Amino acid sequence: MNLEVGTINSTLCIGFKGKNNASSILAKNISEDSCLLTNSFSGLQRDIEALNFYYDCVVLFGIDKSLKDAVRIEKAAEKETKEFSVLNLEKLSAQLAALGISNYLSENPTQYLCNDAYWHLLRKFNRKVVLIHIPSIRNISENFINRLSIAFR
């Protein structure tokens, strides 16, 4: 999946730790070089600070229990300031739709771990980051995880 900010040479996929966390399953399915964040505010900040490789693009997967076989692409994170991704998220949305993956764009970030991680990642990686909320393990089919994995390889 080309997220376009020039030529993408290396993409880091990030999920959250947890045995039954769909974001960790998806991140690992996409890339062996994936990273899993700790499920606490202080832990995820330490994890993000420890990332010292340069990536052209970062894709963060988070969970939204209200989603079912659809994803929500977050345009922004809000903490002390509202930070926006510079990636072409409209194009990403169209590419996912063309692959039969239901999705929608949002500018209203949640105020939980995913938003916090997204905000820190946007600042660390020059806003070349996207947060994609996916369904929880209870609301996501294996087929849907496989289609998402293929889309982001």
Regions found by a protein language model. Give the residues of each.
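Conserved beta-loop-beta element that borders a ligand/cofactor-binding pocket
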Residues: 126-136
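Short, well-ordered, mixed-charge alpha-helical segments that flank or form enzyme active sites
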Residues: 111-116, 138-142
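Glycine-rich phosphate/pyrophosphate-binding loop and the adjoining helix
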Residues: 135-153
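N-terminal catalytic or cofactor-binding beta/alpha core of small enzyme domains
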Residues: 1-113, 119-127, 147, 151-153
